């Protein structure tokens, strides 16, 4: 049986290799993903550089705007790499057994077990099914995010951002680095971090500082990154700022961590070590099923609370709350 091999182009712009068995007149279509079709962009967030490879027709200007302030010109090997690809069907990827679908609201996080101790992940706007699938390498260094071909343009930014947050967290947690769910303001050369459950009013409290505490500006409104660097604890702006477009490539010393809770009054108190740990720990992102990551997280949190004051603010959403907080934490 004779066979020839040739290339064709799908309407999506994807190249396919096709084998045509001339005798049987059977054509087999096989997707080909060539590296030369991709362009890798590199970004540095909190001193950690990573790479993102996009196929022809997808640009960082269109799909990675929040990352533009973090463009890296370094020749260093990236800590990890993420490649964006399309698939005719996510089911064909066979990501594995569904273990759980997490989060109370979108984006929903899916976890699949492909074999014991090895996982694939998904992200979605609803709990019906994953909209994209992340297939990591065993060491999480060379990873691929797949989206359905018909929805590639619509899902690209969503898929890339969620995948990069997960991979960044996994790869940097052992490096004295914490990604934290918090809102952070900058004031007089230092940063003040506000923690709390979703809906507590972290962003609201930050906005009160912006309005009532002169010289204050927003550093990040959802996912800043803390690094312990020598004796210093610094906090960085990131491309991940939730619904607020605040993508500042800046670093400041972390002066205080304040956990908020709603109350009919404004009262602040400093926390002892054990309560400081309990205040910060739930706000940190971590692959908690991975023992190495969890151990590293605990050690970094301990370093942070030993060097940064932690507080609890019972508060109203008013100007007095900002003043009470500022007067307690910003005078140190």
Outline where the language-model segments fall.
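N-terminal amphipathic/basic-hydrophobic helices that include classical n-h-c signal peptides
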Residues: 1-36
């Amino acid at each position: 049986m004779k066979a020839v091999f040739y290339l064709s182009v799908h309407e999506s712009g994807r190249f396919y290799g096709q084998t045509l068995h001339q005798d049987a007149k059977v054509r087999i279509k096989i997707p080909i993903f060539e590296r030369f079709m991709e362009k890798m962009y590199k970004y540095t967030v909190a001193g950690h550089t990573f790479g993102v490879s996009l196929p022809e027709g997808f640009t960082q200007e269109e799909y990675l705007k929040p990352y533009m302030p973090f463009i890296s010109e370094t020749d260093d090997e990236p800590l990890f790499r993420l490649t964006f690809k399309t698939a005719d069907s996510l089911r064909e990827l066979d990501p594995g057994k569904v273990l759980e679908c997490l989060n109370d609201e979108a984006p929903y996080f899916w976890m699949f077990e492909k074999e014991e101790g090895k996982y694939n992940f998904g992200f979605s706007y609803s709990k019906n099914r994953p909209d994209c699938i992340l297939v990591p390498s065993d060491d999480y260094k060379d990873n691929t995010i797949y989206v359905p071909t018909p929805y590639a343009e619509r899902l690209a930014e969503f898929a890339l951002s969620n995948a990069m947050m997960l991979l960044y967290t996994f790869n940097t947690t052992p490096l004295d680095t914490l990604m934290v769910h918090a809102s952070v303001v900058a004031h007089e050369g230092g940063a003040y971090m506000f923690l709390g459950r979703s809906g507590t009013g972290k962003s609201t409290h930050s906005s009160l500082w912006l309005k009532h505490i002169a010289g204050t500006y927003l550093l990040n409104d959802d996912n800043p990154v803390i690094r312990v660097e020598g004796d210093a604890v610094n906090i960085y702006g990131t491309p991940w700022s939730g619904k607020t477009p605040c993508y500042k490539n800046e670093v400041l010393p972390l002066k205080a961590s304040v956990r908020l809770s709603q109350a009919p009054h404004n009262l602040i108190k400093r926390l002892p070590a054990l309560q400081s740990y309990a205040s910060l720990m739930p706000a940190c992102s971590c692959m908690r099923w991975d023992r190495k990551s969890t151990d590293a997280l605990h050690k970094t949190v301990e370093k942070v609370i030993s060097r940064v004051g932690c507080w609890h603010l019972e508060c109203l959403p008013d100007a007095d709350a900002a003043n009470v907080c500022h007067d307690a934490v910003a005078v140190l």
